[in-house]
């Protein structure tokens, strides 16, 4: 089924409101295996809407119109659709009864002929009751094309779609998706590595999305059951993860989790809980952001001992007992400082892990290091590891955010190696 969404309303074209309905409808239709090929917006104008309906009827098998079902003169969607199809408008008894009750309970409200338009449907249409408003929707098929009219307000449209429309459109297959999350590899490199899979995809499909500091891959397939979908998605996932970078590193090393809501932090927190291990932090440029991120999750008192925010050289020396002369000698942005910060954070809190972050968030360079230079230390029983990352060309906020992601990834790898 090839679907098309037409949003009716001059306020959309003038930018007064954002057309969130199209995004919602496309997402929900995809979930039941209906592909949306076109999204269009048109003003409250009968001639232009008639022209658009003529085009849509030739290229789409499902045409969904949103908006223009209200009680004002410029609400003309149903009237225009009826004219296009050569049909009359008739009253829906259930919607009429709801309208009668509405005004009976509000004797001070003026009932006008325009109010009656809200409870009309195109002749032959299946009414779609409005749970939260008065304007009834409708669905009808003419000459192989299914037409649907829905109210514009999202508070009315969403329940109508979820409870009335989707059950009537259900096909034998649904769209199932799986999201793979990658850290430590850029979108351009990932897309280049997967070029053959992307260029030759049919079903299942994969689509990359760049996010701040990471990349996700959405794998999608149409299937009649979750089990059938898993079989197809498992094959594609293994094909992806079996690929290697130009340096010969498996993509499995960069894939850290699944799902829209998963994050490096959530993975690390859950793994620390599972292994019964604790962590402490000493932060400079991130100023407690790592610790605040840990504290966003419930139940972290069992794994998070506490930490230190040591922004200046003096505080690094005072709070972490690192000799000031050593800090001055090596610099606060250095492998030495990251190492000592991590070790002292671990020692002072008696934690299993001590993580540290020191670097240059910007906008100015520091100690000869360009903006985005970050040293991250991880202290544990096996010793202390320090990595240097360069997060150039980013805002100050992004440098700090991505630095924290690198810190969580360093802890994640250590936990997996245990």
From Swiss-Prot:
Signal peptide: none annotated. InterPro entries: CinA (IPR050101), CinA-like_C (IPR036653), CinA_C (IPR008136), CinA_KH (IPR041424), Competence-induced_CinA (IPR008135), MoaB/Mog-like_dom_sf (IPR036425), MoaB/Mog_dom (IPR001453). Transmembrane segments: none annotated. It comes from the Bacteria. Belongs to the CinA family. This is Putative competence-damage inducible protein. It comes from Streptococcus pneumoniae serotype 2 (strain D39 / NCTC 7466).
